[in-house]
Amino acid sequence: MAKMMEPRFKLSRSLGVNIYGHPKAMQRAGKTAGRASKKLSSYGLQLLEKQKLRAYYGVLEKQFVIYVEKAMKASGLSGEALIQSLECRLDNMVYRMGFASSIREARQMVNHGHILVNGKKVDRPSYPIQVDDAVALRERSQKIEKYLSNLKNTTINFDYIETDVSSFTGRLLRIPNREEIPVEVNEQLVIEFYSKK
């Protein structure tokens, strides 16, 4: 299976944003975070935003293009449709619901068969979660200490997601509004990047 192989912290620094949420992600060895940034061209800004959005959700280029093409055909703002579809991927929902400490860990959980959707095992990270879908930790996986710890220590809640710790289940209540999605990116520039191709 294809993977994004660039070291996570290095990728965060090159994009200028902490896409993994780790407190040390933006630090260089022996240096403080941050450096003077050169002024980017219009194309450079669009490319940067595209790279940031791909990195946030861990999506490879070939699959990302499919999301963009679908978003361009959707009604309303294409950029908003793009980020909403990425937000509702199964691996991201597993992360947002608190089962995993990162999207990378969530993707591994899905790949290894730990996750059920509406009572059935789904091992495809890109599986699109629909409103009212129930996402659950498989019964035998509920005894894995790391997953228990992740769920119990989750401190961030989202209004568009409901999580029941006692039943190891989460549910997408509605499609999130753009301002509710905690991703620092100008998604409209991403659409502009691909619309010129």
Curated annotation (Swiss-Prot):
Keyword Cell inner membrane included in the entry's annotation: no
S4 RNA-binding domain residues: 88-153
Stored InterPro entries: Ribosomal_uS4, Ribosomal_uS4_bac-type, Ribosomal_uS4_CS, Ribosomal_uS4_N, S4_RNA-bd, S4_RNA-bd_sf
Alphabetized SUPFAM superfamilies for the sequence: Alpha-L RNA-binding motif
Annotated Gene Ontology cellular component terms: small ribosomal subunit
CDD domains assigned to the protein according to its UniProt record, in alphabetical order: S4
GO biological process terms, semicolon-separated: ribosomal small subunit biogenesis; translation
Record has NAD as a keyword: no
Alphabetized UniProt keyword annotations: Ribonucleoprotein, Ribosomal protein, RNA-binding, rRNA-binding
Pfam families: Ribosomal_S4, S4
GO molecular function terms attached to this record: rRNA binding; structural constituent of ribosome
NCBIfam families for this protein: PRK05327.1, rpsD_bact
Function: One of the primary rRNA binding proteins, it binds directly to 16S rRNA where it nucleates assembly of the body of the 30S subunit. With S5 and S12 plays an important role in translational accuracy.
PANTHER family registered for this protein in UniProt: 30S 40S RIBOSOMAL PROTEIN, SMALL RIBOSOMAL SUBUNIT PROTEIN US4M
Subunit structure comment from the entry: Part of the 30S ribosomal subunit. Contacts protein S5. The interaction surface between S4 and S5 is involved in control of translational fidelity.
Family of this protein: Belongs to the universal ribosomal protein uS4 family.
Name the record gives this protein: Small ribosomal subunit protein uS4B
